[in-house]
Amino acid sequence: MKVTFEQLKEAFNRVLLARGVAAETADACAEMFARTTESGVYSHGVNRFPRFIQQLDNGDIIPDARPQRITSLGAIEQWDAQRAIGNLTAKKMMDRAIELASDHGIGLVALRNANHWMRGGSYGWQAAEKGYIGICWTNSIAVMPPWGSKECRIGTNPLIVAIPSSPITMIDMSMSMFSYGMLEVNRLAGRELPVDGGFDDEGNLTKEPGVIEKNRRILPMGYWKGSGLSIVLDMIATLLSDGASVAEVTQENSDEYGVSQIFIAIEVDKLIDGATRDAKLQRIMDFVTTAERADENVAIRLPGHEFTRLRDENRRNGITVDDSVWAKIQAL
């Protein structure tokens, strides 16, 4: 089915207000969920909203909490999220990293006791729109087996890097081949994954999203490389925030909350003039996209360049929402 941005935001807002969330907070949160969905990231927008409400109802998310700064070391700050709403807190932390970068050239905010930030790419994009390089990542509950294991002991720990090119170039990737959100998107659409995304119950690689969702044997990106990168990202976020690691979140909490996150902004224009910056970025993009195609009918893509197109298409044609997901939201 198709809905407008306004219908989507109103539905989110209604559910939040019904749970006693302050009007200003509810409006800002609903706006972010709707913008994420409008950008084509359904897995962490509309599809994720019922799960967000479940955690709100369970008390994992504290909607009236206010993040507090704990430590300030010039370009580096440490904050405690107080388990406030994840996407609103993450937006505030990247804003703070940008403020620090405007003073120091680089700003780093380490956040502990945070909630799921929904679409991590929103915060990298936020920095790049203002002319900064944006880098951020989060740890999570253990939802992926380390390479060589059957048992979930590491997080998908998504990493975002956004570059202020024109258009913005951005990677937003979990350390698994597919996020659990994308497994859901493909399952709901009745599609196999385009490449292997995990293991079946017999230990064979599989493209069946429903099987992987059920047995939790999701495949690390790049096999042992994604497994290793997940571990070191967890270590850095834990140390800099003095927060909870994947092990602590998994073993000590009843669900995925109280995670640790990193937000970095770099002011490129302190290091290079604008014309030179743009020329260098354009040369990189042209060099990549003019490579000989493996399939003449399939263009070579640059990461993140599709989001502006998807947003514009959704604004023109309406936003596609799975019927079962919309029914869940209407019933909340």
From Swiss-Prot:
Question: Sorted alphabetically, which keywords does the UniProt record give?
Answer: Cytoplasm, NAD, Oxidoreductase
Q: Where in the cell is it found?
A: Cytoplasm
Upper lineage is: Bacteria, Pseudomonadati, Pseudomonadota, Gammaproteobacteria, Enterobacterales
Keyword NAD carried by entry:
yes
Return the protein name.
2,3-diketo-L-gulonate reductase
Active site as annotated: 44
Family named by the database record: Belongs to the LDH2/MDH2 oxidoreductase family. DlgD subfamily.
Assembly, per entry = Homodimer.
Q: What is its EC number?
A: 1.1.1.130
Identify the gene encoding this protein.
Answer: dlgD
